[in-house]
Amino acid sequence: VFQDIINPNSPKITQVVNAGQISVIKPNVAHTMVFTKDTTFLNLVRGERDHENYGITHTIKHVFVDEKEKKLLLENYKFDCRSCGNTDLKRVVSLGYQPLANNLLNKKNDKCELYPLEVNFCAKCYNCQLSISVDPKKMFSNYLYTSSTSKIFRNHFVEAAKKYMKELKLDKKKSYIIDIGSNDGVALKPFLDLGLKKVLGIEPAKNLAKLANKNKIKTFNGFLEKKNLKKIKKNADLILASNVFAHSDKLKEMTECMLSMLGKKGTIIIEVQYLMNTLKDLTFDNIYHEHYNYWSLTSLTNFFNQFDAIIFRAEKVDTHGGSLRIYIK
């Protein structure tokens, strides 16, 4: 963990140093090391630290990482790629330590927790992911963002429902649709309005699941994980996941669950922020702790190949500053 102490606006940055690698620290950079396993460490610093000015004019002792932060790094740092398991990750973006999105303070003197906000890149499968995985219960148990408040999103899902009904030849009486991370039911409501009878939302935020059920959009409150599968009706004709693949820390388990719920002739349609647009348009504000992953079509293809699932169509959509919509069998 290091930070330039000359520049007052410099961020605190983390960096993983794997076995056999050399870490070079520039002058005037405060730094400390958090060892994740028993390690033989060789310090190549020149000169003795116990000199006459030690602790007076330079080499001043400073608690740069306290016990709480050390525990956070040890427990929540993601050392391997969520997609392929590769451990050789390279940091490509650091926005320093930041609070959780929408975590607004009620009082001037209130304090909020800060977490590293950094993107690491996997050169093996081209996945991009955050360095720290914040506990999802802290972010999603009482989620503040309701998708239906946005007219743009409401219209987006209305048009999407019409498109899927026509292209996939969905039957109003028989077809069964599941929406993962369904929020307040914004993506399922248009199907009900079109006369489709069987829908199910899966939403971890209690407040949003309660709101959806109140509006007669059947919703299961919980994460999509194997322990919950027995509570969910399967054989779906269509499974939707809009921006969910950005929000999931347990990608492989979630994907296995989705495939197990899909009917033989069913289709999975995923919408996710498009990394190419983030890079091209410099939309760094789309990088925040809820978005564990940042996808390109190549990295999505590499990911789904592991499950013998095929992306048979991909198209660009305008949501979230530019997104991908992919169709999977």
Regions found by a protein language model. Name each.
Residues 6-27:
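Short acidic-glycine-tyrosine-enriched beta hairpin
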